[in-house]
Amino acid sequence: MYVELKHINKHFGNFKASDDVTVGIEKGKLIGLLGPSGSGKTTILRMIAGLENPDSGEIIIDGKVINDVPASKRGIGFVFQSYALFRYMTVFDNVAFGLKIAKKPANEIKERVHELLELVGLSGLEKRYPSELSGGQRQRVAFARALAPNPQLLLLDEPFAAIDAKVRQELRSWLKGMIQKLGVTSIFVTHDQDEAIEVADEIIITNRGRIEQVGTPYEVYSNPTTAFTASFFGQPSIFKDYSKFRRFDILENAENAIVRPEFVKVTKKTEVQKYKNSAEEGVVEEVDFRGYGIELRVRVNGVLLTARRSFDQPRIEVGEKVDVFIYRMFVTQGDTATLLENKSLREPVVVI
């Protein structure tokens, strides 16, 4: 592993921000640190950067323990959420700042700055000041400045949080492509699930100072190993007694059932339902327009479920009785999560 954290603990007063954190990151990977507020993800990033010191444990980069190495000597580029650009410096001088501190030759600085501005798509803006740039352009300057000294590791603290939605979407794709091109090992902090899934090669899920799960976006989303990870993604409906729903195995010591919108199919009484005999009757309580389609809130057996339908399907109204089929659900037992499939999926289909 290129970056390793071994049994890291960190307290802020009585608050335990990192609780025996142990994780490894391969060289060249783009890693997303994902979790709710207060889960410890930013603390991990700041300890790797040298901006905070762990109470115990080891931080290792490229085989070397760096706990006692000052932040300025770690060879790490850091992109702050607020950009942290120098207001009274031009774009050129902002990008060149670290190189000047390192006393690099003027011709080398000029060449490197122009190379990076071309890389981030800001050629020709060298003489502008941060106040003359858009939010997306400022963030690109911050990326270029962090990359200027050729860091061995790039850290990004919620890099898209201060940017509007459209530009944020564009920058996600741009960042992923840029880091793949450069091959620099990178770690970014986010609380945005979609952002982590879209950008990261691997995701580290944090919760209450601990690592919940590590895996590819597909693995952590589709195969959660803990109750927290199963409930964290999407807009799940969480309820206690799932035995009221048909055709699911009953697990001993089951605690909660977790049903995501994509696990639910809602059809009008007049529509074809592949699993009609296994469907439950529900009553629609909410119908909301979303950019991707229609979102429904349907009460079934006393449980309020969220489901989605496309625009080209027949319209469903509030108060309408509908057929609801649950394909699958996660069931938690203690801290583990098990995926259960509706038994009807394994049986011959009768279309009614």
Range-by-range predicted roles:
Residues G57-V65:
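Conserved ABC transporter NBD signature motif
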Residues L30, A71-G77, Q81-T225:
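ABC ATPase nucleotide-binding domains
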